[in-house]
């Protein structure tokens, strides 16, 4: 998902940065508001950030100019809401660009938009729909994390197709090519991420019930099943 340094045209890099900036700014406001109201949530916020950093650092080669990896943003989106994940993802992506050579500074805005905005908002929406449909809690967690991961990569494929349309088939043909190559690695990774997120949520429900009690998480103190 990390689009590499200098790969996008300048106008695309600027456009994605402009689109991402207000969401990240609102996310900072959202986090400050939540932490000021419930200071005990700092630990859970740290867990969500660490989960995102570790999973998204596990990359493997994929489409030219990008790579495949879990995103780890579903957990934070479920716990704190999608807007709070935007600044977390932005910091994670910045550190990875500077320290691990994953992604880059010129493509930071595009990577934030896909991994830290679209993915978390998709995960939160799926989780809410699953709860509204009365799916088991664990199924909702699994679907949210897995589909949030997949939609992150659909967004990256769209970004690449928009920047590099096929000479004959245009955007649609290019999107099919990018998405098809991503799917080979990303579908198994998304399933794995969904299962791992359920495991982590189980641990949080077992050891951090008090902190989770201040969040709108309906685990009822029970371990969840995928």
Swiss-Prot record:
Regions annotated as coiled coil: none
Principal subcellular localisation of the protein: membrane
Organism per entry: Pelobacter propionicus (strain DSM 2379 / NBRC 103807 / OttBd1)
Membrane topology: Multi-pass membrane protein
Gene3D superfamilies, per database record: 1.10.1760.20
UniProt-recorded Gene Ontology molecular function terms: cobalt ion transmembrane transporter activity
Annotated GO biological process: cobalamin biosynthetic process
Pfam families with a match to the protein in the record: CbiM
Top-rank lineage group of the source organism: Bacteria
Subunit description: Forms an energy-coupling factor (ECF) transporter complex composed of an ATP-binding protein (A component, CbiO), a transmembrane protein (T component, CbiQ) and 2 possible substrate-capture proteins (S components, CbiM and CbiN) of unknown stoichimetry.
Annotated protein name in UniProt: Cobalt transport protein CbiM 1
Gene: cbim1
TM ranges: 6-26, 43-63, 75-95, 107-127, 135-155, 181-201
Database matches in HAMAP family: CbiM
Pathway: Cofactor biosynthesis; adenosylcobalamin biosynthesis
Subcellular localization(s) per the UniProt record: Cell inner membrane
GO cellular component, as recorded: ATP-binding cassette (ABC) transporter complex
């Amino acid at each position: 998902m990390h689009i590499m340094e200098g790969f996008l045209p300048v106008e695309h890099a600027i456009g994605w940065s402009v689109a991402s900036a207000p969401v990240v700014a609102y996310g900072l406001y959202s986090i400050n508001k939540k932490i000021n109201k419930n200071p005990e949530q700092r630990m859970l916020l740290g867990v969500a950030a660490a989960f995102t950093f570790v999973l998204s650092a596990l990359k493997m080669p994929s489409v030219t100019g990008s790579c495949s990896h879990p995103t780890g943003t579903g957990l934070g989106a479920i716990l704190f809401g999608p807007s709070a994940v935007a600044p977390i993802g932005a910091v994670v992506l910045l550190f990875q660009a500077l320290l691990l050579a994953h992604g880059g500074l010129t493509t930071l805005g595009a990577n934030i938009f896909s991994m830290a905005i679209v993915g978390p908002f998709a995960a939160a929406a799926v989780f809410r729909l699953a709860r509204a449909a009365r799916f088991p809690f664990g199924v909702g967690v699994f679907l949210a994390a897995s589909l949030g991961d997949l939609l992150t990569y659909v967004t990256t494929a769209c970004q690449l197709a928009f920047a590099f349309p096929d000479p004959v088939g245009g955007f649609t043909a290019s999107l099919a090519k990018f998405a098809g190559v991503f799917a080979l690695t990303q579908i198994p990774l998304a399933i794995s991420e969904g299962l791992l997120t359920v495991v982590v949520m189980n641990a949080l429900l077992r050891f951090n019930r008090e902190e989770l009690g201040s969040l709108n998480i309906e685990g009822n103190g029970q371990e969840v099943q995928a």
